[in-house]
UniProtKB/Swiss-Prot annotation:
Signal peptide: none annotated. This is Autophagy-related protein 2 homolog A. Residues 14-111 form the Chorein N-terminal domain. It holds the Pfam family ATG2_CAD. InterPro entries: ATG2. Changing L285E: In Mutant 2; abolished lipid transfer activity. Changing F171R: In Mutant 2; abolished lipid transfer activity. Changing V193E: In Mutant 2; abolished lipid transfer activity.
Amino acid sequence: MSRWLWPWSNCVKERVCRYLLHHYLGHFFQEHLSLDQLSLDLYKGSVALRDIHLEIWSVNEVLESMESPLELVEGFVGSIEVAVPWAALLTDHCTVRVSGLQLTLQPRRGPAPGAADSQSWASCMTTSLQLAQECLRDGLPEPSEPPQPLEGLEMFAQTIETVLRRIKVTFLDTVVRVEHSPGDGERGVAVEVRVQRLEYCDEAVRDPSQAPPVDVHQPPAFLHKLLQLAGVRLHYEELPAQEEPPEPPLQIGSCSGYMELMVKLKQNEAFPGPKLEVAGQLGSLHLLLTPRQLQQLQELLSAVSLTDHEGLADKLNKSRPLGAEDLWLIEQDLNQQLQAGAVAEPLSPDPLTNPLLNLDNTDLFFSMAGLTSSVASALSELSLSDVDLASSVRSDMASRRLSAQAHPAGKMAPNPLLDTMRPDSLLKMTLGGVTLTLLQTSAPSSGPPDLATHFFTEFDATKDGPFGSRDFHHLRPRFQRACPCSHVRLTGTAVQLSWELRTGSRGRRTTSMEVHFGQLEVLECLWPRGTSEPEYTEILTFPGTLGSQASARPCAHLRHTQILRRVPKSRPRRSVACHCHSELALDLANFQADVELGALDRLAALLRLATVPAEPPAGLLTEPLPAMEQQTVFRLSAPRATLRLRFPIADLRPEPDPWAGQAVRAEQLRLELSEPQFRSELSSGPGPPVPTHLELTCSDLHGIYEDGGKPPVPCLRVSKALDPKSTGRKYFLPQVVVTVNPQSSSTQWEVAPEKGEELELSVESPCELREPEPSPFSSKRTMYETEEMVIPGDPEEMRTFQSRTLALSRCSLEVILPSVHIFLPSKEVYESIYNRINNDLLMWEPADLLPTPDPAAQPSGFPGPSGFWHDSFKMCKSAFKLANCFDLTPDSDSDDEDAHFFSVGASGGPQAAAPEAPSLHLQSTFSTLVTVLKGRITALCETKDEGGKRLEAVHGELVLDMEHGTLFSVSQYCGQPGLGYFCLEAEKATLYHRAAVDDYPLPSHLDLPSFAPPAQLAPTIYPSEEGVTERGASGRKGQGRGPHMLSTAVRIHLDPHKNVKEFLVTLRLHKATLRHYMALPEQSWHSQLLEFLDVLDDPVLGYLPPTVITILHTHLFSCSVDYRPLYLPVRVLITAETFTLSSNIIMDTSTFLLRFILDDSALYLSDKCEVETLDLRRDYVCVLDVDLLELVIKTWKGSTEGKLSQPLFELRCSNNVVHVHSCADSCALLVNLLQYVMSTGDLHPPPRPPSPTEIAGQKLSESPASLPSCPPVETALINQRDLADALLDTERSLRELAQPSGGHLPQASPISVYLFPGERSGAPPPSPPVGGPAGSLGSCSEEKEDEREEEGDGDTLDSDEFCILDAPGLGIPPRDGEPVVTQLHPGPIVVRDGYFSRPIGSTDLLRAPAHFPVPSTRVVLREVSLVWHLYGGRDFGPHPGHRARTGLSGPRSSPSRCSGPNRPQNSWRTQGGSGRQHHVLMEIQLSKVSFQHEVYPAEPATGPAAPSQELEERPLSRQVFIVQELEVRDRLASSQINKFLYLHTSERMPRRAHSNMLTIKALHVAPTTNLGGPECCLRVSLMPLRLNVDQDALFFLKDFFTSLVAGINPVVPGETSAEARPETRAQPSSPLEGQAEGVETTGSQEAPGGGHSPSPPDQQPIYFREFRFTSEVPIWLDYHGKHVTMDQVGTFAGLLIGLAQLNCSELKLKRLCCRHGLLGVDKVLGYALNEWLQDIRKNQLPGLLGGVGPMHSVVQLFQGFRDLLWLPIEQYRKDGRLMRGLQRGAASFGSSTASAALELSNRLVQAIQATAETVYDILSPAAPVSRSLQDKRSARRLRRGQQPADLREGVAKAYDTVREGILDTAQTICDVASRGHEQKGLTGAVGGVIRQLPPTVVKPLILATEATSSLLGGMRNQIVPDAHKDHALKWRSDSAQD
């Protein structure tokens, strides 16, 4: 180098300097530089230029060549100073100093030219050799010496190269300004980058030793440049309008510290590596932005597009021949496709992973752009737009989704293009720290006026860096001082940024970026108004990285990859120019985040501003610009994550202030996630929008509920679970998927019709069959009466509804929980969680942070409505078809709903197929689907004692297990704001419970349960076992999968105008079993569950709770109740095939209605208590079978006035029929069970029963017809007046016994006031006491009252408002017997129309009189039919092998007939136990039984009755028991009787309409002195009876009830305890509620003493103050003895019973009236029986003996002769009508004498027939008769028992008898002859015929007598039709034989 140190000449120096300036900078100047214009100091080597304006065109030309997206608008240079060290040119560096450089740029408009081929801006434009040649050739004066050889030129070039490498450029106060004006009237924006100092030099300047040697022929492969910056500031300016003065730019960012950039440039393409590599370091970066600035910067960055996709596509979309590279690409793609086809993997929806779906890569297959296929294009768009559109409901679909998305985060899918990509640029930056402060308001009201200046002054003033510590908490005070307003702040340290650009052929580019954060924190700092301290929300923090490992592993790693490829524009119907696929992966360390909805709402508003797309103004006829099809995949993963869910305080007031501070509760839910992974996919493009999926998975989730200072409670645990269907260890992971579907057209006008739809517009189908709309309710209509029963849909209907709703929802949330455990340690925690979630989280509404007022009031920082949408023209739809569009009825689903959406800018067919038909269905707002594979809910509740006090140290526990459960919810269904649905399903559910469990410490960490039954809890509700359900036991298999065990569907409808919310709740429980456990009322499972769920709602600000109406429909199908008593050896099972509960529940209303419908239910008993699992058919006995039962409960809270207008509690029951199937032992066991349940036997161990001798002695000491010798306190405290009245009644009853049964004496007793108070309507007031002046009137009225009550019910007449007139002496017969006409009114009778009101409907026999008070409690049973089947034998216990018949043993037994095909044992429910005898059966049927029990309030209500009566007698309760028809049927095989007991009717005694066979009425009244217990007035009425008694049936009933009574355990009261007895109350009616039902039916019911009684609370018998048997009951008795029995009843009685034959014996039960008081039901029965027996013995023996044998017919015979002679005389004496008397006598003679004669003749003929049959049997040979002949004889004998209805049938039957007899005789002779011939030949045949001759001779006599009997019977029935009816009821017919 020494030879180059010769001195330079001045001419050369001037030319070199001028040339350098002109060559490098001349064309950028507006004026050409010359030597004269230069300010040169050649000796010092400096050049200076000032105030230079840049040439815009030249600079833009350079920028275009570099593909810069910016262009220069204005450029100015303050000064340029160039210093050349001539003395040390090769050792020192040249300097260029540029001061005051100002560049104003703007985004380039229009396409850019071709790609840049030169990089001279970095390599100084040319080589040094060229520079040397030009320099020496440019105008140098001709030297005197000759030119230097070529070596000198190279040495000169080497010198120049050395000098150029050492040039150092310094920029001072540089300002780069980028302006952007949208051009649509909006204000522009400008961003300035101000650099205080920038130094640019080669790396050789810093370290000359590392510089490569200079070679002018071979330039270095890499160039290294160094940039050093200092004082970098970012400023923002909003361009003002023309008339407004400009404002100074506002600083938005600063770079503190020293910045250094190392630029590495590759000059030789043969070397690997990127062409450009930049590595830099930066101290820290601070940014301060407002929402307005953020939006404007986003628009600026959108305008400054780094890649012009349209220009790129235009350049590269050229047709060219296939080259070698193209062939290689085709070969590579084909190989990959073949390999993928061999593996046979499913097609992935990702266009990068599956080349078959990614047909947009047409350059891989076709080089010519015109060869693309439109079909392939449509298929490609279909595949990209329909990805995961239909969401999955079932778990297997979820597992498929998990497996399909199993790619590891950050790993790119294999792409054949990546191998051919070449690195182009690489950027690596290291930042010491980054802070981004985003203001939440544009103009903060608080803080200093110049916030930006104050902010950056605070940070620039500090000497030390802001990131000196590893904790960010020390920065918070500095930020409080720097920015005292609400903002969101991102703070990061040790930031490493890496950016790489790869390019390839066909215009493909790949951009990848990685960012590492050593520490990271994202905070929201909210400054409430008027506060000095902010409130922080830690959006993202990393508490675990603050230790020593912070530098070892970054807390956040962000990877972003973008692949850009072009799409040919020659493809039809596509306006897309580029396809961009981006993948963003974020790997975090263990992080923590606060989830606060208010903060997220404010943050989302800011992010929404940054993501608003800038749309160009669209005209009517303008063609849409080419758009970019973009697909972005976002992935986030971390080892662990902690999410703290903060519950907001819901504020629904009209104008809430979102900036008033954090409106959050003190409680929070901490969610700890293990291995969380988040994935999202966003797509945008010109085609139809596609759904957006957000997916979050984790392996484990632990939820902890924190309530202020209380200890944290672990309440939730979710974990993965093994797939039971998978062979390997495949897990289901917890998963949350959020799907945001694109918003469909806002109106129905924005739908373009298809071709088929256009045809449909012209031709409408007259009959259009549509499928029903999907619904969560069952489409099968189920009606009950006139009401439709709403039932949840089956699983298929549920799935259809859910999948359709999810697909048509604006936003859907799907949650999969493989294994979940919810723990609720107390009601307080549950109430807190309930209110936080239901009343805070779900009621929270986002604030209106993006208002859209008028432009004048538009705040800065928020876009107007034009920024979000633009108006565009759509195709108008025909109004004719529009009617179907708006048809949202359930029948509006048809095939034409599959219309597709068309893009407005598209041409041709549809772009993509829609998943459903949103054209006819509006979108729902939000839908949720939660799937639980296995789940458990554990709830700890309080345990209370019988007094309602909480027990210490114990608690109740409820555990609910669920398998395969789904929870679905949708709000604003089909766009209707007030409509929503809620569904809950579970294939299997089990409830465990225990009332009292010892307290144990709560777990600090919730473990996953094993889902095994809890050991300390008892199963309460569980799936029915295989052998329990009736259908399951019947072996019905192969019918597929039935409904789920639990199904619930709820429809929620809110009427905002009325503020009424209606819930339609339907619940179905299928094949479930309830295990019943007796417990205290406060400790039952339902009491504890309801008490646990009964929480109070916290008020919500600005929310008025609507009136809630709940319509409840609960359906139980094939369910059962299992009860196993502790101290009774029996197991009880109640099954119900269908059980429906319906109710209307209205909050804040006084009335509540509940209806139960029970269909096909049964009660079973079993004595196998030691076996755990039993079979229903094998081990149980059905004792109760209910066909249909309806139960209605109505409650009323009462009025504020305290008066009752309706009962507080009313129960109504009605049913079809109830069957009771029992033997004596099973019936006794049923009675014992009822007693056990009523006495709550499980809660009281059985005490020692008293000895039988004590019980017998007690019974013998009591006289049945007298009062007890030692009356109880209640009886002793009767007032003196009642005692006197009782004595008078006793004396009168003795006088009545001496009179005939029909005679009555005047009764003058004042006791009449005690006769059913109020049941007389229109009667005069009660008579005064004894001795009063109105005693005679009282006696007359009392007698007439008696007669009237005997004829009918007084209250019936009273209820219909009719009045019976009472007249003195009415009804008393005269002494001489002559009738006397009494004139009541002397004048004419005036008839007044309408005087009596007409009854509205039929008479209600159960209704109380009108003046009775309104009852507080009413129990009504209406038309309940009961059939009691009494079987012989035993259902339980040991049974003999031969199964002897109990009750028919010994000589009483008769040969039983064969059972027909319809016997009861063919029905499995009636098969009973192994010892049940089905041929021994009797049936007791009570048809249409009605019962009413009313309890009246303690205070008497005002009524029309007299005050004196109310003061004397106050009703407490009233009972009415009515049996419309009572029958006892004889079904014994040994008996021919049909009906054992029934109602007797005849022509003389026809049955009255609406008459009841048995009526019992009881009225309990309070005594007048209030000293005793309640007193009862009892009235019984009975209709005439007919008894047909067979001896076997009589003895069977005797044995049955004897065994029944012996098997019933005696009622022994248990220990008196607080829970076993009712508490003493002030209301005397309270203890009567439990006694009312048993007053009429059983005598064992007792009532406890009233609260006003001073007696001990032991139960006392009922005191009957009055007992009346109101009607005289005639009884007709037929008895048929069969055999003598002397072993049980004695010799005489046995002979009498066996030989007696009674026919129409008449008995009468006389009227009874007992007013002297009876204590106990047994005394009442004893009194009635004693009275009736005495009357029968004294007065009715002739009528009883008149039916012995034929005596009845004989008496009728003489009665007819007497009537024939006496009736004319009696009629003549009466009124002189002799002919009328003759007619009556002849009629009586015909009906009595003729029928009696025919009956006697028939008896004689039947006696002859019986004698002939006996002779026939004696003379008949012993040879067997054929079976067919026996069958014919038996059939004829059965028909023989049926008498003909009239003479015609008698003649026909006689003819048939003779004909069949002759045929039978001939057939018998033929059979005997043929059989004898077969055995012995001719001799045998002749012998057989001879042996058959004697019976054949007798046979005509039998036939003649039988035919005569038929004729006589027909004649008798013709004369007396009642005889035929009685015969048909008495004897069995052909159908009854079976």
